[in-house]
Regions:
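Short, hydrophobic/aliphatic alpha-helical segments
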Residues: 32-46
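Conserved catalytic-core subdomain
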Residues: 1-18, 159, 213-341
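Flexible, glycine/charged-enriched surface loops at secondary-structure junctions
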Residues: 96-98, 114-123, 207-210, 262-270, ...
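Extended Lys/Arg-rich, glycine-bearing segments that form polyanion-binding/interaction patches
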Residues: 7, 79, 84, 88-202, ...
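Short acidic-glycine loop/turn motifs at beta-strand connectors
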Residues: 23-32, 57, 64-69, 76, ...
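Conserved phosphate/anionic-ligand binding catalytic regions in large, soluble enzymes, centered on
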Residues: 45-61, 286-290
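Short glycine-rich loop/turn motifs
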Residues: 19-21, 58, 144-146, 164-165, ...
Length: 341
């Protein structure tokens, strides 16, 4: 299929309407078969559960053109499983995992003309989401739901290449103990908006959220997990029940152990340790890894020696290996790559 006439090299990270999206409705205790539709609008009641009480969750994933010309997506089964966890926590009906993966493949195949070519630096971003659709005026779960998937071509999340970020230790909390920090609920992201706008006004790229209970342990940012590297090349990632289980982080841990032979620790990371790390990065679907050059803790600057001007050496190896796997340049572990076309 001929590609759309898009300036792939200068594509921003924003929404571009594509031709098809998947829609399935839940009513009377069951999901319908679902359809691909050209209609990009959502029509719901003014009193819909999602509008009144934020009953919604979502996922984020990408499709790529590999070096050998295939269109693939990366570990969609893990997105399906994570969305199931989100639905259960928000009292929403689970969209079956096998149907989730199949619907993702349908949407990507139907929008093949929008999948950026190999080497362009651009990808097709895929957004599955679900919301309560029927009128709800009392505080309770909705009875009817809609599950949708749209796709949009996006350029690199970090425009102009990989530039180390300056982040601050944040006084706001992202998640509460026994709350919803471990799921991909829309409400979590709404709560982070004030803090990120404030950070940008203060001249910072991102927030480093701490645990709400003691405010001594590193959690994550508003949309990415942390990954640290010690001076003796050990990879360390924060462990907490209120952190979203990042698929990128999980994959980087495997890459570190199995491909690079590095020692990995998943454990509590204390703020007082930050000065001792050699490298720091933010990992997630959008950018894979964004290097952090400086962390500011209430006026105290912590400069990462390997990240002030460019990505640190270990972080760079992790990034190059994982993106190599995603793009088909490096052999992937079994089940990681779902070939669509």
């Amino acid at each position: 299929m001929e590609k759309k006439n898009i300036d792939w090299a200068n594509l921003g990270f924003g929404y571009v309407q594509t031709e098809k999206r998947f829609v399935s409705n839940y009513k009377n205790g069951a999901w319908d078969e679902g359809v691909l539709t050209s209609d990009a609008t959502v029509t719901i009641s003014e009193c819909a559960g999602v509008l009144q009480y934020a009953q919604t969750c979502f996922e984020g994933m990408k499709a790529y053109t590999t070096e050998d010309g295939h269109i693939v997506t990366f570990r969609p089964d893990l997105n399906a499983a994570r969305m199931e966890d989100s639905c259960k926590r928000l009292e929403m009906p689970v969209f079956p995992q096998d149907r989730f993966v199949d619907a993702v493949c349908q949407v990507v195949a139907a929008n093949e003309a929008y999948v950026p070519p190999y080497g362009s630096g651009a990808t097709l971003y895929i957004r599955p989401y679900m919301f309560g659709s029927n009128p709800v005026i009392g505080v309770k779960p909705a009875d009817e739901y809609q599950f949708r998937i749209f796709a949009t071509p996006v350029g690199p999340y970090l425009k102009g290449g990989v530039k180390p970020l300056t982040i601050r230790v944040c006084d706001f909390d992202r998640a509460a103990p026994h709350g919803t920090g471990h799921i991909k609920a829309g409400l979590n992201y709404a709560m982070s908006l004030y803090a990120i706008v404030d950070a940008h006004h203060q001249g910072y790229d991102e927030n480093m959220y701490l645990d709400a209970a003691t405010r001594t342990k590193v959690e994550e940012t508003g949309g990415a997990n942390f990954i640290f590297v010690t001076k003796d090349n050990k990879v360390v990632t924060p462990k907490s029940s209120t952190i979203l289980p990042s698929i990128t982080r999980r994959s980087l841990i495997t890459v570190a152990k199995e491909y690079l032979g590095l020692e990995v620790e998943e454990r509590e990371v204390y703020v007082e340790e930050l000065k001792d790390f050699a490298e720091c990065g933010l990992c997630g679907t959008a950018a894979v890894i964004s290097p952090v050059g400086k962390i500011v803790d209430h006026g105290t600057e912590i400069c990462l020696p390997s990240g002030m001007t460019e990505m640190g050496p270990v972080t760079k190896k992790l990034y190059e290996t994982l993106t190599g796997i995603q793009m088909g340049r490096i052999e992937a572990p079994e089940g990681w790559i779902k070939v669509i076309k």
